[in-house]
Amino acid sequence: MKRILAVIFALMSLSCFAEDRDSLLVMFWNLENFFDHIDQGTGESDKEFSSYGTRRWMKKRFHVKCDAVAKSMMWIGEQYGRMPDVVGLAEIENKGVLYKLLNSTLLRKYDYRIVHFESSDRRGIDVALLFRRSSMDTVFTSLRTPEHDGHKMNTRDILHVRMRLCDGDEMDFIVNHHPSKYGGEEESSGRRVSAMQSMMELCDSLDSDRIISMGDFNDTPDAPAFRLTEDRLMNKARYLHQRGEGTIRYEGRWDMIDMFLVSPELDTCTVMEVCRIPFLTVRDSKHTGLKPFRTYSGPRYIGGVSDHYPIILIMNRDKIGVYKYYSSMCRH
């Protein structure tokens, strides 16, 4: 029954999306090493992803990726009746990459603005947020660097942006890219738990009941790190994960590691979907089925965009507060 209701809600959301001013479309995408083609001397990854580096990441390849990202976002716009209002991104080298994405492609006509800060990540990659100026504007931004065993980690910062929508409503957006499983899943689990703890401390400091936290958490919804979120945030990917869906494919298995977490008040007015973009999907040559069309297969350039599919959160803002209403009814 729950599944039927979820499907009905999603269809109703989509059918009126283009005309509904109370709707909001949020997107997140890990863009797999989205570097420019210039070696600026900022680290090994910067050198690797340059015209003369081991990846032979040339200007033409960079612009091919920019065009493919723009085409993907516009495909999403066609599918959902509007361009994403907010876009969280991971694995971005610098602000210049985003500036070129927004100004050298068809995205230039959509008036996206950039929120990005450099982090101390050892690979030289950051998270970022794009937003449409016609939909909202920033109130303030903040960063939080995850700590582990009393020390700041050399990983991506957690980005927080408070937005004021056109009608004056405010909403908090958080973008994450938690530590990978490099070194082993069990050995690295503590770092992801620490990153999640940092994210929850940020959420607690906001005094807000309208939080949307998104990102690549490098863990599935049943991992230990998500026990920290259970009392305060609703995981919109949990049901999709239980159905066997995912955003990346490894050794023939789908893993749901990209997801949205929302405040309880936003739970009943939001639906998450994985966007399997047709032209960014290829056949898995080692296993049966399909997989995302990534930029590199090992060291070999193959011309795709990412090993992750983007995810979408559909929000019907006129349904905000339904959670509080029903919670109140249950208490009486």
Where are the language model's segments positioned?
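Sec-dependent N-terminal signal peptides
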Residues: 4-15
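Extracytoplasmic, non-cytosolic globular domains
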Residues: 116, 159-243
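Active-site environment of divalent metal-dependent phosphoester hydrolases
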Residues: 94-96, 122-124, 181-183, 218-224, ...
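Structured beta-strand-rich core segments of catalytic domains in phosphoester-bond hydrolases
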Residues: 86, 92-170
